[in-house]
């Protein structure tokens, strides 16, 4: 007789038809809230409608219902992303010079937009080479398309249509998984299964299939393109996939198929799985064979990782066990209870994910120029500058978002009665020590970093260059950074014996890669100027962290307002009759943190823009002499505040200021308009609610006099609304100004 263990019951993890599809309900503004659904009495109604439409916590207390709404909304988000991608590919197919660029990427610049000749706007269509007139784009799409093996505009059309189909599919999925088959709460909380599927499916199989595409499609097509074969002569992607002999002509080991893999004779594959380091001298991008090797390795890593967590089979890790075992000598209960927090508070979960994704986005920004992954990306200076700037801004916003949702978690989801002596509780109990020390660090960094600049400005003004902090007088060399650079430059042959070149040319050595007479990358020297500005980076980042962390740690209570948790996430002040309690809500800390995030990122992208123009980007003569765009002036000019104002902001703004009448004139108009949007924000930030209410009353009086008064009573923005409108215009105005300044400059000189 065979004794079997009882089969685990199959759990039903969805509810069928939980909520009926009702267009009547959707057509009613504010249907999710009893108050808002009544319709407007005052103009505040429209603001509340927008503020609460996606605040699912305010619609219901049922965690399952909230989870379903979030899940469904994610499909909507994916649909929008597919729609956007489809638009990008369609522009590439319909309005671009992609095929011309592909045939001569060093002389022809990418363009995927042609302006219609309405009221003289055709001036914006600049000559991008090859007889094509259009707007130069700096998104990097052309470079990605070439790297992935797209050789014709027809292929772009097909991809665009495919993305539209996926967009429709995602919209359907969002409706289906809310109205037809909605997952139960247990499904959202099954973290081990989720980890296994996401790690194996998204990251493991995703990387494996990408590596497969790169080997079978991208690699042969890029080989032909690098050898200057006409794109129309190159076999189509499916021919490489279906006909192994085609690949074997380029890479003989292909003839052996999978035999070397199963006989462990893996070195046979070294033709297309390499570990070279450095850049391909033809394209100025990473070696495609290195990239393939990377994706294959990542795939194997995540396929293993995706089998590590305990589900129905009773083997593997349990996240709860791991967290509860995580105790140290000074950490009390450690992570006990964290599992319950992360499976019942999506704000806590989102906060951690935003912090990690934001940091990762900033890491991406730094790798895009130091290890440019796509062909002809490194010599497209406009795209390099745009990608760095874009990823820095996105990373900054995501990190502020992490603090915002951490604070919302503290206010709405944290239960202090059941949390005792775990890590979070211990951090909260010594929050005064944390914040006061962090405050001291900010003061120290601020005075010292700024003080070094002020010293230099003073000495410069007094005509005493020998007393300045500079590479030629009193040196403050970034010795630790230089040591790290040197270690990496020496790594090939020592710590990485298989590699021929270091991971990035920026580390040092004497390697320089130039493509078509333009510098792709070279070793980046660091000196006193970098030491100074890096301490400004440290200062601005620490102040941002101080504001955001104070908002999180004091979200529920403080000495000033012990019952802050009862007032909610956002409130203007602690009620009438208690002065000095405004701007203390967790929301206000996010509001203030956004300004410092803006400061931080601005200094970073200014540093990057000037440093690259001064020390990296430029042309190279036949004799091998490099002529940089700003002639290496960063080291001597950026060591004073005056230098930053005169030789960076003012000198490099000449292109955007003088752009009128040229194809760059749109940037001049944006520069002007975005300054205006930025200035408009100050109206909301510097004036109070009462001022506007008084003005409104008088305007309403005039309307009554003429018998044209509206039924909905006009109201001034609330304090929080005014601040929200203010910070939005401040950031968008500032970012758009910087964008216009950067692009007009780099397109003109790059």
Curated annotation (Swiss-Prot):
Catalysed reactions, as listed in the record: reduced [plastocyanin] + hnu + oxidized [2Fe-2S]-[ferredoxin] = oxidized [plastocyanin] + reduced [2Fe-2S]-[ferredoxin]
Residues annotated for chlorophyll a binding in this entry: 683, 691
Cross-referenced InterPro entries: PSI_PsaA, PSI_PsaA/B, PSI_PsaA/B_CS, PSI_PsaA/B_sf
Location, primary (coarse class): plastid
GO biological process terms on file: photosynthesis
Pfam family name, one: PsaA_PsaB
Membrane topology term: Multi-pass membrane protein
Subcellular location: Plastid, Chloroplast thylakoid membrane
Binding site for phylloquinone: 692
Free-text cofactor note: P700 is a chlorophyll a/chlorophyll a' dimer, A0 is one or more chlorophyll a, A1 is one or both phylloquinones and FX is a shared 4Fe-4S iron-sulfur center.
GO cellular component: chloroplast thylakoid membrane; photosystem I
UniProt keywords, alphabetically: 4Fe-4S, Chlorophyll, Chloroplast, Chromophore, Electron transport, Iron, Iron-sulfur, Magnesium, Membrane, Metal-binding, Oxidoreductase, Photosynthesis, Photosystem I, Plastid, Thylakoid, Transmembrane, Transmembrane helix, Transport
Membrane spanning residue stretches: 70-93, 156-179, 195-219, 291-309, 346-369, 385-411, 433-455, 531-549, 589-610, 664-686, 724-744
Binding site for chlorophyll a': 675
Annotated binding of [4Fe-4S] cluster, by residue: 573, 582
Family: Belongs to the PsaA/PsaB family.
Summary of the function given for this chain in its UniProt record: PsaA and PsaB bind P700, the primary electron donor of photosystem I (PSI), as well as the electron acceptors A0, A1 and FX. PSI is a plastocyanin-ferredoxin oxidoreductase, converting photonic excitation into a charge separation, which transfers an electron from the donor P700 chlorophyll pair to the spectroscopically characterized acceptors A0, A1, FX, FA and FB in turn. Oxidized P700 is reduced on the lumenal side of the thylakoid membrane by plastocyanin.
Oligomer and partners: The PsaA/B heterodimer binds the P700 chlorophyll special pair and subsequent electron acceptors. PSI consists of a core antenna complex that captures photons, and an electron transfer chain that converts photonic excitation into a charge separation. The eukaryotic PSI reaction center is composed of at least 11 subunits.
Protein known as: Photosystem I P700 chlorophyll a apoprotein A1
């Amino acid at each position: 007789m065979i004794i079997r263990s009882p089969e685990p019951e199959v759990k039903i993890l969805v509810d069928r038809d939980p909520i009926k599809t009702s267009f009547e309900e959707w057509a009613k503004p504010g249907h999710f809230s009893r108050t808002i659904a009544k319709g407007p009495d005052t103009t505040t109604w429209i603001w509340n409608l927008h503020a609460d439409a996606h605040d699912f916590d305010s619609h219901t207390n049922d965690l399952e219902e909230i989870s379903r709404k979030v899940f469904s909304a994610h499909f909507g988000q994916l649909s929008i992303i597919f729609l956007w991608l489809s638009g990008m590919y369609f522009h590439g197919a319909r309005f671009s010079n992609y095929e011309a660029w592909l045939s001569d990427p060093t002389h022809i610049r990418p363009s995927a937009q042609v302006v219609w000749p309405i009221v003289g706007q055709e001036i914006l269509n600049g000559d991008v080479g090859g007889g094509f007139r259009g707007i130069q784009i700096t998104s990097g799409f052309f470079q990605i398309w070439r790297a992935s093996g797209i050789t014709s505009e027809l292929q772009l059309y097909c991809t665009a249509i495919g993305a539209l189909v996926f967009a429709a599919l995602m919209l359907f999925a969002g409706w289906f998984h809310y109205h037809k088959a909605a997952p139960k709460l247990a499904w959202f909380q099954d973290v081990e299964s989720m980890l296994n599927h996401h790690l194996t499916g998204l990251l493991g199989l995703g990387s494996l299939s990408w590596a497969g595409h790169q080997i079978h499609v991208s690699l042969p097509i890029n080989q032909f393109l690098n050898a200057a074969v006409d794109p129309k002569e190159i076999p189509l992607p499916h021919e490489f996939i279906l006909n192994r002999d085609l690949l074997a002509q380029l890479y003989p080991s292909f003839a052996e198929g999978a035999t070397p893999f199963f006989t462990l004779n893996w070195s046979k594959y070294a033709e297309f799985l390499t570990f070279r380091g450095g850049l391909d001298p033809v394209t100025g991008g990473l070696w495609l064979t290195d990239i393939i090797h990377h994706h294959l390795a990542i795939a194997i890593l995540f396929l293993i990782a995706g089998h590590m967590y305990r589900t129905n089979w009773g083997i593997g890790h349990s996240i709860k066990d791991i967290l509860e075992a995580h105790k140290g000598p000074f950490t009390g209960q450690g992570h006990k209870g964290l599992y319950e927090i992360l499976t019942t508070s999506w704000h806590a979960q989102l906060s951690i994910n935003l912090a990690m994704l934001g940091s990762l986005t900033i890491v991406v920004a730094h790798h895009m120029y130091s290890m440019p992954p796509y062909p002809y990306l490194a010599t497209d200076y406009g795209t390099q500058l745009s990608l760095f700037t874009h990823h820095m801004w996105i990373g900054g916003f995501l990190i502020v978002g992490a603090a915002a949702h951490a604070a919302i978690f503290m206010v709405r989801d944290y239960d202090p009665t059941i949390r005792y002596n775990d890590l979070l509780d211990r951090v909260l109990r010594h929050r005064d020590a944390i914040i006061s020390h962090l405050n001291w660090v900010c003061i120290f960094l601020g005075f010292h970093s700024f003080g070094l600049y002020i010293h230099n400005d003073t000495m410069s003004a007094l005509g005493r260059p020998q007393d300045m902090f500079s590479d030629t007088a009193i040196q403050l060399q970034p010795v630790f950074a230089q040591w790290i650079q040197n270690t990496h430059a020496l790594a090939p042959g020592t710590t990485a014996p298989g590699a021929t070149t270091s991971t990035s040319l920026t580390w040092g050595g004497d390697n320089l890669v130039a493509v078509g007479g333009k510098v792709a990358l070279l070793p980046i020297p660091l000196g006193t100027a970098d030491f100074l500005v890096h301490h400004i980076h440290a200062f601005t980042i620490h102040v941002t962290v101080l504001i955001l962390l104070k908002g999180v740690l004091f979200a529920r209570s403080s000495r000033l307002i012990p019952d802050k948790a009862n007032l909610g996430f956002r409130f203007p002040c602690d009620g009438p009759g208690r002065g000095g309690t405004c701007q203390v809500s967790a929301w206000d800390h996010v509001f203030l943190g956004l300004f410092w995030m803006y400061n931080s990122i601005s200094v970073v992208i200014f540093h990057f823009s000037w440093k690259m123009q001064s020390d990296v980007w430029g042309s190279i003569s036949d004799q091998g002499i490099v002529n940089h765009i700003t002639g290496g002036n960063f080291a001597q000019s950026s060591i004073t505040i005056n230098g930053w104002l005169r030789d960076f902001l003012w000198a490099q703004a000449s292109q955007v200021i003088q752009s009128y009448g040229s194809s760059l004139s749109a940037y001049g108009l944006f520069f002007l308009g975005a300054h205006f949007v930025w200035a408009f924000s100050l109206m909301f930030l510097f004036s109070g609610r009462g001022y506007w209410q008084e003005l409104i009353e008088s305007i309403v009086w005039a309307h009554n006099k003429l018998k044209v008064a509206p039924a909905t009573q006009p109201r001034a923005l609330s304090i929080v609304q005014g601040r929200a409108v203010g910070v939005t215009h401040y950031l968008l105005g500032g970012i758009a100004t910087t964008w216009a300044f950067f692009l007009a400059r780099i397109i003109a000189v790059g």
